[in-house]
Amino acid sequence: MEKITSRENAKVKYACRLASSGAFRRAEGRFLAEGRKLCPELCRGAELETLFCTESALEKCPELSELSGEHYLVEDHVADKLADVGTHQGVFGVFRTPVHTLEEVKTGGRYLALERVQDPGNVGTLLRSAAAFGFDGVLLSDGCASVFAPKTLRASMGAAVRVPVMEVGAMPAAIAALRAKNITCLAAALYQSQPLSAARPGYPGGVCVVIGSEGQGLTEETIAACSGTVRIPMTCLLYTSPSPRDQRGS
């Protein structure tokens, strides 16, 4: 296995740029992930092109050598450059980004849609929840945190490739596309909403729950595009994040 000793190595610099720039990730169709558990987990739904690992990491996890792609040993100071956080596990992978579109949405499916959810941790947690509940896909509007940014990947714990993620641009147009397939779209908002428990239990055409940004909630255009609005009643006033709300109901 070839060993990289310089922080200025071209492959290392390329990987670092993937981690730091969303525009570069989109242009290249690739992303960088790190972690002894996360990298193998991502291999379940994304193609691993390049694996970087330190000697100590390989000694602890020899099964890493069985992963696909090109493998490189890196010295600790090189791993420090690749790392997004100060304490790392010495394992990094460059993956091809899975691409999914609205054409894959199917009648009868269950979907989650996020509009302008900006915190990477929140996006990652919602992806993980969608995967855990067996959702068929997640739609992300413009303004959402990048799914394949390092912080989002850590929060999603591999869910970013276990559930199809579709970047849809403007949410009202995406909702129109779903409703054209007989999918009921429910906006999570306070204004003129009904409790989630009172919503009709069966949606034979499928259902999509639409959640808005942490601070502003859903846009009026998105709420108007949906089939209805719902809320989750709370027994006391607690701060939750993300907490979708419509400004008119504040």
Summary of predicted features, one role per range:
Residues Y239-P244:
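Conserved small/polar residues in nucleotide/adenosyl-binding loops
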Residues M1-E55:
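Boundary-proximal intrinsically disordered activation/regulatory segments immediately upstream
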Residues V99, E104-Q192:
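RNA substrate-binding interface of SAM-dependent RNA methyltransferases
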Residues V74-E75, E115, S141-D142, P164, ...:
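Short beta->alpha connector loops at strand-helix junctions that form conserved
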Residues V74-G86:
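Glycine/small-residue-rich loop that forms an oxyanion/phosphate-binding "nest" at active or ligand-binding sites
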Residues A188-L237:
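Active-site/ligand-binding-proximal alpha/beta "capping" segment
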Residues L67, S156, V161, A225-C226:
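Short, structured coil segments at secondary-structure junctions
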